[in-house]
Amino acid sequence: MDIQLKTGCFDDAALVRRVVFMDEQGYENEFDAIDEDPNCIHVTLYVDGELAGCSRVFPEELERVADAEAPLLPACDMDEGVAAGETYIMGRVAVLSTMRRRGLASKIIEASEAAARDAGAKLI
């Protein structure tokens, strides 16, 4: 099983999210303004060249783009000592049903954490 991880492939991430969250789980609209922000990192995973899953990770401040009521830093005790812009939120982790039960979600999470840290995250 050849696994490839990429960042910046929003169209592929959108496809996975549409299938998993909208078609399978029935959410009406899976997308928001955060998806379009250049600071939002979309991670996609491929198995033997075939799209299998995705996630997104972004600076906490972007959450207020979608929700003006989102909490301000520090949101929890773990945030103490972490500067604005150093807390990232990971979400929208999804794996296509045909690719599940292979440990792929954990690989997506690991890649998302690495991408966030590369972007300056200290707390995810």
Give residue ranges: language-model regions:
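Active-site rim helix/loop that mediates acceptor-substrate recognition in acyltransferases
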Residues: 18-52, 56, 62
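Conserved acetyl-CoA-binding loop-helix of GNAT-fold acetyltransferases
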Residues: 95, 101-114
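Conserved beta-strand in the GNAT
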Residues: 44, 50-60, 65-78, 87-94
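OB-fold and OB-like single-stranded nucleic-acid-recognition modules
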Residues: 7, 33, 58-61, 81, ...
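Short connector loops at helix/strand junctions that flank enzyme active sites
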Residues: 38-40, 50-52, 83-90, 119-121
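A short beta-loop-alpha structural element at the N-terminal edge
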Residues: 1-13
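Conserved GNAT acetyl-CoA-binding A-motif
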Residues: 109, 116-124
